Structure formats: structure tokens, C-alpha cells
Amino acid sequence: MATLGNHPELPANIESMLEADVSTLFLKAGCVPRTKRGMIGNIILCDVDGEKDWTNIEMEQLQGDLESLIEGNPERHDCFREIDRTGCLVLQIGDLRITCAYPPFSDAREITIVRPVAKLSLSEYDLHSKLIGRLSDHHRGVFI
């Protein structure tokens, strides 16, 4: 599992927006980039200072750059394309989960980059012992 900050170097303009207190970066064609920042319990959504609206071409270029990062790091088990469907792409790049959406899935090209905010172990959840037993015995099924 990747640790916080453990990812291949992203394009400089993206790395600069992913400051230490940023958990999520939202990019959308025709809009100013926004971040979700702060600690759990005190999170705010704000525009990125000094940034202009991103164009569709810039968004396409960034998506291509992100896909190239995966192709350029075949030795990393934490860099892969998880979902690739018409209008939707989900990438794991180190500790970052990245979603790319575009028409017809969304009304405009969007990229969301999410960092992990907490890493909890199973024991930190208030779960019934039967459920913990089922999970640890490798039973199959859906966990909701």
C-alpha cells in the first residue's frame, strides 16, 4: 500500500495545487480548480488562488499525462487503470485515486484527484465479532 505522498511525480502545476492540507483537487473544463482542504471535522471547499478556468484541451492533456504515468511505471503495483469505460476512467497512481469523467458520462470534462485522509484498521471500527470473523475467514460476498 502506498504511503501519503508516495506517487510518481505529477505535472508540476498539479503537484503545486496538492498542498499538504489538501485532500481533494477538483478540476472541470470551464471552471477554476477547487480544493477540499483541512483536517477531518474542519474541511473547507475553496478556489485555488491564482488559477484560471481550465480549458477542455488542458483537461485532455492532463488526462493523457496521467495515463502516461501509469504506462511509465509498470514496476509499481499501485499504479494502474482500474476502470476504463466510455466517458469514465478511474486511475490509481500511488496514494492517489483519480477519476476522469467526460461526455457522455458528464456534461464537461472533469478530473478529481483524491488523497487518503485516514488509514484505519478493522479493529478501529465498531463491528460485531461475527462480521469480523466472516471478513477474516475470506468469505465472499458484498460488504456494504
Identify the residue ranges that each predicted region occupies.
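Hydrophobic anchor at the beta1->P-loop junction of P-loop NTPases
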Residues: I144
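P-loop NTP-binding catalytic core
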Residues: D49, W54, S68, G72-G141
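N-terminal anchoring/assembly modules that precede and organize ATP-driven motor systems
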Residues: M1-E82
